[in-house]
Amino acid sequence: RWMTSGGLGTMGYGLPAAIGVQVAHPKKLVVDIAGEASILMNMQEISTAVQYRLPIKIFILNNEYMGMVRQWQELLHDKNYSESYTEALPDFVKLAEAYGAVGIRAKTPDELDEKIKEMINSDQPVIFDCLVDKQENCYPMIPSGKPHNQMLLGPEDEKDVSDEGKTLV
């Protein structure tokens, strides 16, 4: 099953949605794929997952930016970047451990397969901090105020996608 906020700009949607889905489907694998800024909107809810032994998996695509905001600024506002980058991020592995969850980090693409298996095989809540290219864009993208049929599908030429970005596809 797939749940999404559908490009509505609902930063922070994924973590509480994952908790609700895990309660509704306790035997299913539930993975929240989100950026680090989205997770920080309500990170405290990981305590709910730990308290109720909900084995949700939080897979953070960590580029140290509000990724979609940075991407809008790049593609739609002539690279006029404003307030979308932060150096003041927590160590998500330590944060997971502080809550009593499992923390995993992947720094390079060659680590992904093994660490994703570790995440999936855990019977506890997991925060997976996946460090990604800071300038990699995420597609498809629905520009602010546009309908779904006007989504941006990405560079027409694959040469515009970094090797790190291709690894995640």
Provide a role label for each language-model segment:
Residues 1-169:
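Thiamine diphosphate
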